[in-house]
A protein has these predicted regions:
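Intrinsic disorder/low-complexity flexible regions in very large eukaryotic scaffold/regulatory proteins
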Residues: 155-156, 188-192, 220-227, 260-271, ...
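Polar helix-capping/helix-linker motif
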Residues: 115, 165, 248, 313, ...
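Structural detector for internal amphipathic alpha-helices that build alpha-solenoid repeat scaffolds
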Residues: 37-38, 44-55, 72-84, 104-117, ...
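Amphipathic alpha-helical segments within extended alpha-helical solenoids and repeat-rich scaffolds
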Residues: 199-204, 231-236, 270-280, 316-328
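Structured alpha-helical
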Residues: 440
């Protein structure tokens, strides 16, 4: 809280002025037994201790650093420390970690900024701390504080090594990559190649962040589509119902949100070109399109968020026609499902393109069942509504496509409740068709 920090600063300023006054009887030795009895700083007074070090002279700084080095770094303004005090602080923190690797304890999740602490005179002291291979808190703490430091460019080799090392923890690699992202001169192309080749969840997450910061428009669409194809391998098969960690692939959706409409169109064309099942299994068993279907589905959602009607129905079908899902999605969960269900013109444009040329009744039946009858594994927006049946019957009648018309013949609704029974507008429409063309009457009579 701000009021607490102000109170700590004012109290420290008052005490330091008295301690450094040669005629005042108050000394640091007299204050410490109250602030840190038995050499252990009170938790509620660690902020006061940190500000006293920041405002005090070299002697005061050295004494407080020896007492509680972490309090000096985490509180007050460590950038005000003298050069020798900064070095002493780093050495003292290293000693503390050697005795207690997890010295931050519950303070681990705290975030604070001390970027001004890292200046040219401490760069050489930092390098060995970054390259040590232990799992203590010190290295992570330093990386957190380095995020906005101006000396990152001098630490680029060490930071790059941490980022690209697959044996490092996710926490360390992520922090190191954030430091690299603040180096304007750093060449990320080589790092991206290593991260994408590793193809782990952590490495691809870092790579996605690099692409976000650099700007997706700076990358060739072929490069981006290749990256997304690698990301598709992160998705499990349909039998893996539960995952221990939720949201590990959220970075893919976040990256997609940075794509422009033009970039999305190019990527969707690239990713769905010649997309088909290559495992030969039934759609409910097929896992070879899981990842790419999820990614393309998210991209189509983003496309509909950006694009305005009218839409190119043929292109939309090419994007979503061969996707395979193992769960249905509702309109409030997916923008593409919402648009496809609400936009009759788009949906019926797709219907015209798909069914219009077909004359093989078996093929019509298979496409209808697998893609448009609310099938569990097709895109949830591809669903035929009652007005779509009317549209298809009229389309077939106008184009003299008897086979298509016959494939959508409507039965008598004999099993409806008595109060729901009555005239059927679809059958009435079909009867009108049969009165106009004998070919349709023959099928109607046979039916």
């Amino acid at each position: 809280p701000v009021h607490k920090i102000v109170a700590e600063y004012c109290a420290a300023d008052y005490l330091i002025k008295r301690i450094t006054d040669p005629v005042d009887v108050l000394t640091l030795t007299k204050c410490l037994p109250v602030i840190a009895p038995n050499g252990t700083a009170r938790d509620e007074l660690r902020g006061l201790l940190g500000w006293m070090a920041a405002l005090g002279n070299r002697s005061v700084q050295e004494s407080i650093i020896e007492l509680d080095a972490y309090a000096v770094l985490a509180n007050g303004d460590p950038s005000q420390l003298e050069r020798s005090s900064k070095r002493q602080l780093l050495h003292r923190l290293k000693e503390i970690e050697a005795a207690d690797p997890y010295f931050r304890r519950s303070d681990f999740w705290r975030r604070f900024s001390a970027a001004g602490f890292f200046t040219q005179d401490v760069v050489e002291e930092i390098k060995p701390l970054l390259t040590m291979g232990n799992e203590g808190h010190l290295r992570g703490l330093i990386l957190e504080l380095l995020a906005d430091a101006p000396v990152n460019c001098q630490l680029a080799p060490e930071l790059s090594l941490l980022t690209l090392n697959s044996n490092e923890s996710e926490h360390i690699r992520t922090l190191a990559s954030r430091c690299l992202l603040n180096i304007k001169e750093y060449d990320f192309i080589g790092a991206l190649a290593v991260l994408i080749f590793e193809a782990s969840n952590i490495s691809l997450n870092i790579a996605a962040k690099i692409i976000e910061v650099a700007g997706p428009e700076k990358f060739n669409p072929t490069y981006l589509s290749g990256f997304l194809r690698v990301c598709a391998n992160l998705y499990p098969d349909h039998k893996a119902q539960f995952e221990r960690v939720v949201g590990t692939r959220y970075f893919i959706k976040k990256l997609i949100s940075y794509f422009s409409q033009h970039t999305l169109e190019l990527l969707l064309d690239e990713l769905t070109h010649n997309l088909h099942c290559h495992c030969g299994k039934k759609s409910y068993e097929c896992d070879c399109r899981n990842g790419i279907s999820k990614i393309v589905g998210s991209m189509v959602d983003r496309y509909f968020e950006l694009a305005q009607a009218p839409f190119d129905s043929v292109r939309i079908w090419q994007w979503i026609g061969n996707l395979n899902f193992h769960r249905q999605c509702q309109p409030d969960q997916s923008k593409s499902v919402q648009v496809l269900r609400e936009n009759d013109t788009l949906r019926q444009g797709i219907i015209t393109y798909v069914f219009g040329p077909l004359t093989d009744r078996k093929e019509i039946f298979n496409i209808r069942v697998e893609k448009f009858d609310g099938h569990l594994h097709s895109h949830s927006g591809l669903h035929l509504w009652r007005n779509d049946y009317k549209f298809i019957l009229n389309l077939a009648f106008e184009t003299d496509n008897v086979d298509l018309w016959t494939s959508f013949l409507v039965n008598h609704q004999r099993y409806k409740n008595r109060e729901e029974q009555g005239p059927d507008d679809l059958r009435a429409q079909m009867r009108q068709h049969t009165l106009s063309k004998p070919a349709f009457m023959r099928e109607w009579a046979r039916f």
